[in-house]
Amino acid sequence: MNEPASAGKITAHSVVGQTRPMPIAKVLTVSDGVIAGTREDRSGDVAEEVLTGAGFDVVERAVVADGADSVAEALRALTGGFAGLVVTTGGTGFGPRDLTPEGTRAVVERDAPGLAEAMRLASPLGRLSRQLAGTVGEALVLNLPGSSGGVHECLGAVLDVVPHALDLLAGGRPH
């Protein structure tokens, strides 16, 4: 008997016939322009679309102004008691107010350099990114660039391993 076409599809919550609970995610946009109402939150929208398309349930979105302190405060609120993925968009470049990595570093307990490296290698301009990846309790935090294309490229580079990372953070077995 033929299985439905979706039966073999690998999503963020199914691997080799084993079903996992749907992973959850939060999106934090870091942008003075979005806060001021002079820019639309396109990168946050793209992050939500990509995550939802990969099988994540995006349970919260927030926007903060650029700056290390605002990012750190928001990340503490978003990761406190949370088991899931938190992505930031924006503030990872060389601009004077691009301080998302500094705010992230103040909160992250353990670095995940392989994820950050994979995201940087996803595009030639990624080499200009200062993005970080790391964990806070059972939350995985990924810094993404502020461009819509960069969000697509970076998430595309790591989403295949994020569910496994979340399982490990929740106490799952490595293999």
Specify the residue positions occupied by each region the protein language model found.
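Non-catalytic beta/alpha edge segments that cap or flank active sites
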Residues: 1-175
